């Protein structure tokens, strides 16, 4: 029995499902999860000492690779000064200034500890600002596990939403309307029916939790125009795509300004940190200035802020995003070419340092299209690549991530492994 198996069996005795986040359990792909012992650059090593090329990077934060020496140094410098204070620090101001500089639509920002906290707080703020209750979200977009966001569409376009998780009361879910991603007609119909009841529309401008699906410019511009017309707050959930698709996030890529933005992952440099921010007039409704309550004991934790601030400084290096985007595109295009050579139906896409792999004829534009991919073939591919020492997301519904440490040699090794994996799939 491998060390991974031993640890997984042991974990299941004291941790529900043996993991602290469901996707880690390998339920989607089968098999035994890899327990990570250490990581460096583009690699990690599991409990059995096997090395893997890592294309998850903690689900996005590790944009400069694992244990970057400058991030490590920044963290080590603050450790001796204290782990947590529950009081303001100068470093909180510095990271807020950096975020506001890099994302111009964010005039003020509040630090929190997780993406779920960021989206949950942004929705409460939007409701407090507008005095409205209805929320609009989109099928396939994941915004954390707050009750009002664990909702799926009802039986008709304009019906009440239904909970997607046990424990979410229908009375909460009914305030959330779920529409199809990238469907402008459905969006216009919803705003025509109840636009003046909508407190906020929350969207991943580049979705990463139904695999990688890009928002179309037409869709995102329609969102911006309709929210402005009806006085609804447009919330871009950039917890995943923020500082991944461009230095200023998806807003910089598309040239669209949100009213509120949720950030996470990269801004913590691998530490538990997230944030929400936006227009000054909206943020002024937060306590202690306004009546919308939000708080957190560990918000702005000095260690997390140190890691995040150094990461934000590193990604501003000249040519950083050009090189990272080119490497990610080389990976995606190379995988598609290897599949094509083997005669395996497959598509790949990339934007910035995110990529998507689909066992389908073309790149999907909605959750419904993603579900038509060959999941069984993806699962086989995942395990073939895992055996080769390449670690992709253990689910056909998750995006992948490249770091600045994924150099040509790493990409070449990945494509060579993929060539063998696709040949096995085609056999």
From Swiss-Prot:
Its EC number is 5.4.3.8. Its main location: cytoplasm. InterPro entries: 4pyrrol_synth_GluAld_NH2Trfase (IPR004639), Aminotrans_3 (IPR005814), Aminotrans_3_PPA_site (IPR049704), PyrdxlP-dep_Trfase (IPR015424), PyrdxlP-dep_Trfase_major (IPR015421), PyrdxlP-dep_Trfase_small (IPR015422). One of its GO terms (cellular component) is cytoplasm. Keywords: Cytoplasm, Isomerase, Porphyrin biosynthesis, Pyridoxal phosphate. One of its GO terms (molecular function) is glutamate-1-semialdehyde 2,1-aminomutase activity. The keyword Isomerase applies. Belongs to the class-III pyridoxal-phosphate-dependent aminotransferase family. HemL subfamily. This is Glutamate-1-semialdehyde 2,1-aminomutase. The gene is hemL.
């Amino acid at each position: 029995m491998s060390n991974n198996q031993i640890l997984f069996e042991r974990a299941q005795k004291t941790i529900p499902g043996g993991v602290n986040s469901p996707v880690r359990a390998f339920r989607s792909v089968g098999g035994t999860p890899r327990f990570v012992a250490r990581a460096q650059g583009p690699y990690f090593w599991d409990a059995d000492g096997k090395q893997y090329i890592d294309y998850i990077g903690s689900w996005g934060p590790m944009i400069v690779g694992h244990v970057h020496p400058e991030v490590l140094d920044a963290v080590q410098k603050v450790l001796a000064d204290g782990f947590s204070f529950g009081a303001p620090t100068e470093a909180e101001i510095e990271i807020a200034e950096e975020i506001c500089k890099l994302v111009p639509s964010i005039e003020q920002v509040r630090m929190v500890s997780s993406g779920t906290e960021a989206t949950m707080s942004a929705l409460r703020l939007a409701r407090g600002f507008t005095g409205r209750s209805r929320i609009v979200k989109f099928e396939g977009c994941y915004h954390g596990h707050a009750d009002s966001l664990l909702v799926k569409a009802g039986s008709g376009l304009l019906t009440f939403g239904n909970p997607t998780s046990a424990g979410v009361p229908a009375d909460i879910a009914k305030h959330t309307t779920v529409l199809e991603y990238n469907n402008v007609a459905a969006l216009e119909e919803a705003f025509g029916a109840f636009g003046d009841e909508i407190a906020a529309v929350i969207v991943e401008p580049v979705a990463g939790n139904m695999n990688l699906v890009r928002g179309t410019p037409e869709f995102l511009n329609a969102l911006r125009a309709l929210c402005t017309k009806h006085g609804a707050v447009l919330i871009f959930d950039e917890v995943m795509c923020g500082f991944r698709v461009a230095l200023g996030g998806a807003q910089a890529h598309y040239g669209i300004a949100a009213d509120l933005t949720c950030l996470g992952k990269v801004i913590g440099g691998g530490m538990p940190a997230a944030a929400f921010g936006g227009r000054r007039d909206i943020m002024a409704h937060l306590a202690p200035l306004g009546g919308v309550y939000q708080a957190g004991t560990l918000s702005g934790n000095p260690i997390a802020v140190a890691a995040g601030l150094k990461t934000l400084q590193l990604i501003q290096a000249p040519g950083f995003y050009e090189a990272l985007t080119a490497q990610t595109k080389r990976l995606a295009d190379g995988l598609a070419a290897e599949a094509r050579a083997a005669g395996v139906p497959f598509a790949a896409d990339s934007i910035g340092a995110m990529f998507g792999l689909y066992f389908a004829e073309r790149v999907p534009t909605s959750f419904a299209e993603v579900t038509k991919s060959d999941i069984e073939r993806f699962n086989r591919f995942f395990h073939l690549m895992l055996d080769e020492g390449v670690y992709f997301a253990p689910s056909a519904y998750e995006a992948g991530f490249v770091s600045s440490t994924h150099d040509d040699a790493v990409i070449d090794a990945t494509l060579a492994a993929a060539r063998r994996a696709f040949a096995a799939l085609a056999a």
